Design a protein with these regions (language model features):
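Domain-level signature for soluble enzymes in the chorismate/prephenate branch of the shikimate pathway
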Residues: 1-202
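Single conserved hydrophobic/aromatic residue that forms the stacking wall/gate
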Residues: 197, 204-214
Length: 214
């Protein structure tokens, strides 16, 4: 039986179940092995303040190298630029929507402004790339760290002092989350003129399948 290594978030499990279903369709029996990564364990500080790399992948890669699991599923954007020696990417999913979504409380909307957000709005994101992009369009906004999985970050938007948060469209769509209670600005690089400032994370929307070398 093949062991599939995955993080335990709802989105990570969706991705693992999707691979599990594909393998079942060709007659492969599998089981999921949930692995906590450094990024899962440290939730109170931004990524730029955490030392090292592979925040959401290293522990899973270690399990592959030690043959505790047979295959891993990762969001491609979480993988380090350089592959770990002894590991390889065996396959990729079809690409989902690569856009970022600016998810705005309706009480904080100002359609006359570039981001459709009121002046001086507080936006939750822990991504340096996203912070630079947002402040390019509206220097008045304040970007503050927000951590957690997709449902957790939406709960923080509803219950804490944020006017908006940024999420990857692919994750929202995979989880089937209803965003009707919010105003949405989609940063789709296919439609926006200024590609430099609306570019998503490289490889966003792709899932990688990484096998053990054993």
């Amino acid at each position: 039986m093949l062991k599939i290594g995955t993080r335990g978030s709802k989105l990570a499990l969706w991705q693992a179940y999707d691979l599990q279903a594909q393998l079942k369709a060709i007659g492969e029996d599998t089981e999921l092995v949930i692995i906590k990564t450094k990024g899962d364990q440290i939730q109170d500080i931004g990524f730029d303040k955490i030392e090292g790399k592979g925040f959401f992948t290293k522990e899973i890669e270690d399990a592959l190298l030690s043959s505790d699991i047979d295959i891993a599923v990762h969001s491609m954007k979480d993988l380090p630029t350089e592959m770990v020696e002894g590991l390889s990417i065996a396959g990729l999913s079809s690409r989902a929507n690569p856009a970022d979504l600016l998810i705005i409380k309706k009480s904080s909307v100002d359609t006359s402004r570039a981001l459709k957000l009121k002046e001086g709005a507080k936006i939750g994101t822990s991504s340096i790339r996203r912070k630079v992009q947002l402040q390019h369009f509206d220097p008045s906004v304040e970007c503050v760290d927000v951590r957690g999985n997709v449902p957790t970050r939406l709960t923080k938007l509803d219950t804490q002092d944020y006017d908006a948060i940024v999420l990857a469209a692919a994750g929202v769509e995979r989880l089937g989350i209803d965003l009707d209670n919010y105003h949405i600005v989609e940063f789709n690089p296919k439609e926006y003129v200024c590609l430099l400032y609306t570019s998503p994370s490289p490889r966003d929307g792709l899932l990688s399948r990484m096998p053990s070398s054993a």
